[in-house]
From Swiss-Prot:
Name of this protein: Carboxy-S-adenosyl-L-methionine synthase
Family: Belongs to the class I-like SAM-binding methyltransferase superfamily. Cx-SAM synthase family.
UniProt cross-references to NCBIfam families, sorted A to Z: carboxy-S-adenosyl-L-methionine synthase CmoA
InterPro entries: CmoA, Methyltransf_25, SAM-dependent_MTases_sf
EC code: 2.1.3.-
GO molecular function: carboxyl- or carbamoyltransferase activity; S-adenosyl-L-methionine binding
Record-linked Gene3D superfamilies: Vaccinia Virus protein VP39 (3.40.50.150)
Keywords associated with the record: S-adenosyl-L-methionine, Transferase
Binding site for S-adenosyl-L-methionine: Y35, G60, C61, S62, D109, V110, N124, R191
Swiss-Prot/TrEMBL GO biological process terms: tRNA wobble uridine modification
Catalytic activity: prephenate + S-adenosyl-L-methionine = carboxy-S-adenosyl-L-methionine + 3-phenylpyruvate + H2O
Gene symbol of the encoding locus: cmoA
Assembly notes: Homodimer.
Domain of life where this protein originates: Bacteria
Length: 234
């Protein structure tokens, strides 16, 4: 289903309600540059580095795209997805069933998720929706819940410190979205709806967040404009 949510005037802040869920795959595919490419890259990296029968959890799994990509490469992995939206989880279960993938799904707040003896934790464009005062605590709980040698994979929309450069990058991104079929009105509507809901950090702030939780090193494996994917190793 095509994303046309913001063709009409917005009446509330952005949230992952049933309407958003119904168009989510199209929305993220057209809104996040090279979403499919970066997702496949992460899956290939994890498929190479994870031990046999590794446990992987995706916090904010949405419609399970990342988990399904990983399952296609490594069917020995024990996969789990958590999302606060019951509609997202319902969609994820349907997709997993269609692919014949054995994935455990649950509805829940990622801040309250039990992370224990995991080999990998994924958060794809989810951390940016967590209020800043709670992010450090969440990343620390992820670190604590990973096995030694485990990896935390997180993709984030980022901001730049230099205001002029940041403005240029936003304009480039909005031009990109227009080429994906969104009107300038839709782009402006979504930007307004996301204000104070999606709160991005700089690249350095994201690295500091992970290192401060205890991770020994942080690598970046993908970047396009305001979008990055990090791997933090325990």
């Amino acid at each position: 289903m095509r994303d046309e949510i913001f063709k009409e005037p917005i009446k509330k802040q952005f949230e992952f309600d049933d309407f958003v869920v119904s168009v989510f795959d199209d929305m993220i595919g057209r809104s996040v540059p090279f979403y499919d490419v970066s997702g496949k890259l992460v899956s290939e990296i994890l498929a190479k580095i994870l031990p046999a029968k590794a446990h992987v959890i995706d916090l904010g799994c949405s419609t399970a795209t990342s988990l399904l990509l990983l399952n296609q490469l490594r069917d020995d992995l024990v996969l789990e997805g958590v999302d606060s939206s019951s509609a997202m989880i319902e969609n994820a279960r349907k997709k997993a069933k269609a692919y014949g993938a054995k994935i455990k799904f649950s509805v829940g707040d990622v801040l309250e998720s039990q992370i224990c003896q995991m080999d990998a934790v994924m958060m794809n464009y989810t951390l940016q929706f967590i209020r800043p005062p709670k992010r450090a605590q969440l990343v620390k709980s992820i670190y604590d819940g990973l096995n030694e040698g485990g990896v935390f994979v997180f993709s984030e929309k980022i901001i730049y410190e230099d205001k002029k450069f940041a403005k240029n990058m936003i304009e480039i991104y909005e031009n990109y979205k227009e080429k994906q079929g969104y009107s300038r009105y839709e782009i402006a509507q979504k930007r307004e709806a996301l204000e104070n809901v999606l709160i991005p950090y700089t690249e350095e702030e994201n690295r500091t967040l992970a290192l401060g939780a205890g991770f020994k090193r942080v690598e970046s494996v993908f970047k396009w404009g305001n979008f990055m994917t990090f791997l933090a190793f325990k």
